[in-house]
Amino acid sequence: MAQQYLPGQRWISDSEAELGLGTILTQDGRMLTVLYPATGETRQYATRSAPLTRVRFVPGDEITHFEGWKMTVREVDDVDGLLVYHGLTAQNEARTLPETQLSNFIQFRLASDRLFAGQIDPLAWFSLRYHTLQHQSAQLQSSLWGLGGVRAQPIAHQLHIAKEVADRIAPRVLLADEVGLGKTIEAGLIIHRQLLSGRASRVLILVPENLQHQWLVEMRRRFNLEVALFDAERFIESDASNPFEDTQLALVSLEWLKEDERAQDAAFAAGWDLLVVDEAHHLVWHPESASAEYRLVEQLAEVIPGVLLLTATPEQLGLDSHFARLRLLDPNRFHDLDAFRAESSSYQPVAEAVQELLDEGRLSQQAHQTIHDFLGAEGEALLAAATDGDIEASSRLIRELLDRHGTGRLLFRNTRAAVQGFPERQLHPYPLPCPAEYMELPLGEHAELYPEVAFQSQQEPADEQNRWWQFDPRVEWLIDTLKMLKKYKVLVICAHAETALDLEDALRVRSGIPATVFHEGMSILERDRAAAYFADEEFGAQVLICSEIGSEGRNFQFSHHLVLFDLPAHPDLLEQRIGRLDRIGQQHTIQLHVPYLETSPQERLFKWYHEALNAFLATCPTGNALQHQFGPRLLPLLEDGDDDTFQGLIDEARAERERLEAELHAGRDRLLELNSGGGEQGTALVDAIEEQDDQFALPIYMEQLFDAFGIDSEDHSENALVLRPSEKMLDASFPLGDDEAVTITYDREQALAREDMQFLTWEHPMVQGGMDLVLSGSMGNTAVALIKNKALKPGTVLLELLFVSEVVAPRALQLSRFLPPLALRCLLDGNGNDLAAKVAFDTLNDQLESVPRASANKFVQAQRDVLATQIAAAEAKIKPRHVERVAEAQRKLKAGLDEELARLVALQAVNPSVRDSEIEALRQQREDGLAALEKAALRLEAIRVLVAG
């Protein structure tokens, strides 16, 4: 045994192939020393059990000299135990290469190379590679790719908008849903799907400073998107010439970017694919002038191909302000305000006619004439059928009208009135006597609304005997209310973090009720833990006390009792508070509990919100406008003023609200709502996601993946597992997300309630990263097994091969939709027959047993010539299937893009919102895609040798 190892021989490690080629240094009978020059590592092995395989190339192999030149082997000599290769270079020059001069960096990655080099993998890894290919192929072709993995309830209008917009090249749209309908989720879905498809690689998100944290939490928690938050400090500390170029997703506050010219220059030059702007209705524009913020966004929109503007509804904005947003998207199309006003007024009668068609099922003479004037003669047949009550004709007629709508492709706007699924609200006011301690407080800084903060600021910090919660009647009321609601989860929101912390103290000291807090001073991890403690049904807190800012971006809809311990100074903040529970999918009526101090400003603010704005029982789209209009008169009356004057203000504001709401309702564009709601397409997406959620394919696959990589999984609770790296963890780069442990769930409902758990879907970075590790490495591309089947004569050899049709092209072409990495499987018997169609992979897999590596290697070396011939024969057999798959991919690409091109060209003829650049980009994508598919190659992915026993 000792004579087989000689200094200078090249061997490769069976267990550490990444070390490259090893060179025998010494061999003293019992111990063997091997140097791996590529990494500078040295290993010592017991001679009798060294996990090494001799590197022996054969004629036809291409080998590399350590200086980098290559040659194809023609002959091999054995000179005193060392191999000497003779062959020809690419220039047909004869060369000799002793094995001592082989490149140290040779790694055997091709399946056939690794098989013949003795690098034979465990059976489980071969199976994992096959299943990884199948699952990846299915996902890349799925219409749900980028839509199904979000930690949110699947909602039809959101999914419809996301798919419609994300599937465009460089989309430029306005997302203008009413409050509470999920504009941020729509934007996140669009970003996520564009990134996964390759349509976008780099995204700039521009938001008001007070929304930065909310966006950060939403992107990370819901979409698993790692967003880099940029501010002045981070920008200055960066060593890069352009700090933005180091990140894929940047989150920037509009206030900071507006003031920092160097950061602006860097943003303009960073080469973004998509710009997302939240609260875009605050960008001020007039025909004569524009604000600095508006001009900044305008300049960015000129250099960034895709733009998403999140804004208030057009009715709330007013026509001029709405025009200002559209100018940012398409300045060539929207350059004349007067022309836009005229165009918009022409759509209103059409929208009213559509409303009549929807309500009555047929058209009056006037409505018929309105639509005829709008469509012209080409729509006459459809119009006649729709007038007679033909339902299918009515649907097609509405689609035709939508296609011609001036902003139908640019603007998506849903209203609560049009979207189903919102809960009702019930208000429970609790007037309480105002304590004497608050009567003497100085006014200012909203002290009249939050007297506990003003009172506590006057006390000594160490004075535990004089705490506001010892006398404030709201605290006693809260304790009694929580006891009464002891079976329910209760969310308490107050304006300040200090109040939230004090309330936790009060509940602990005075009642023992289990509570947890949630405020802006906590880290994201601490907030996750607090939210998880609140969500836990069995052992969790009954009450979660949140500050105003701390609860931004969080979803607590598993609760339906909301205590507003105080009231915010603005109706938008009140709506945000209620919106923590009042969301689509909430199963119960929202119970709003509002304590307030009598004869104090709190009582008047309660009446203002309830009687003037109706802000408790319904969303208040006019709240911001009314606050702006009446705020200067309201504030003095909160502190002082007689009751009659205050009541007069309430009556005036109520009348104005009713007038504005009537205007909004009259201005509703039913055509836009139909386009934005998604109809049957949106419902079909929801059904498909729910069906995917109910399948067990992902948990089964992930257990296989965890076992292969040495990740331990154990039950945590119902529908949840804890993952930990085991002592045998194979690869430290496995994207577990935590070095110690991580809790996961495959259940969407569980994930919505427990944000501390990772929600595993096919799109999750852990799943995608694990699949990438399998397919980018070589592990599992060879195997040798014993097959136990009475129908096979002992000694019979079967060869199972997996091939992949591979196309090298930019991800933005999305060729994986048409030619995904599906495994083309071939199962050859000794006569060269392909049995793959008759014997399924899993059926065969169940009949296999492992073979010791040494025995497997010995068999492979003995059968090398036969196996090499069979591999070549298998490739010849599979080639026609590859050619057929590529041709089918070309047909699908051509048909799909030709149809989309024809639709856009026809649409452009009747709707100027279709850009020339969009059509040209689609034509280019078609040409580039077909050219890339023409070069698709067949690659041998994996080999398994099966010996009947």
From Swiss-Prot:
Which ranges carry the Helicase C-terminal domain? Answer: 474-628
Q: Which UniProt keywords apply?
A: Activator, ATP-binding, DNA-binding, Helicase, Hydrolase, Nucleotide-binding, Transcription, Transcription regulation
Binding, ATP: D177, E178, V179, G180, L181, G182, K183, T184
What PROSITE patterns does this protein map onto? HELICASE_ATP_BIND_1, HELICASE_CTER
Domain (Helicase ATP-binding) spans: 164-332
* Entry's EC annotation: 3.6.4.-
Question: GO terms for biological process?
Answer: regulation of DNA-templated transcription
Please report any disulfide bonds recorded for this protein chain, giving both cysteine positions.
none
Location of motif DEAH box in this chain is 278-281
Q: Does the keyword Cell division apply?
A: no
Whether Cell wall biogenesis/degradation counts among this entry's keywords is: no
Q: Which GO terms describe its molecular function?
A: ATP binding; DNA binding; helicase activity; hydrolase activity, acting on acid anhydrides
Describe its function. Transcription regulator that activates transcription by stimulating RNA polymerase (RNAP) recycling in case of stress conditions such as supercoiled DNA or high salt concentrations. Probably acts by releasing the RNAP, when it is trapped or immobilized on tightly supercoiled DNA. Does not activate transcription on linear DNA. Probably not involved in DNA repair.
Subunit structure of this entry?
Answer: Interacts with the RNAP. Has a higher affinity for the core RNAP than for the holoenzyme. Its ATPase activity is stimulated by binding to RNAP.
Instruction: Please report which protein family the annotation says this sequence is part of.
Output: Belongs to the SNF2/RAD54 helicase family. RapA subfamily.
What protein name does the entry list? RNA polymerase-associated protein RapA
Tell me the organism: Stutzerimonas stutzeri (strain A1501)
Gene name for this UniProt entry: rapA
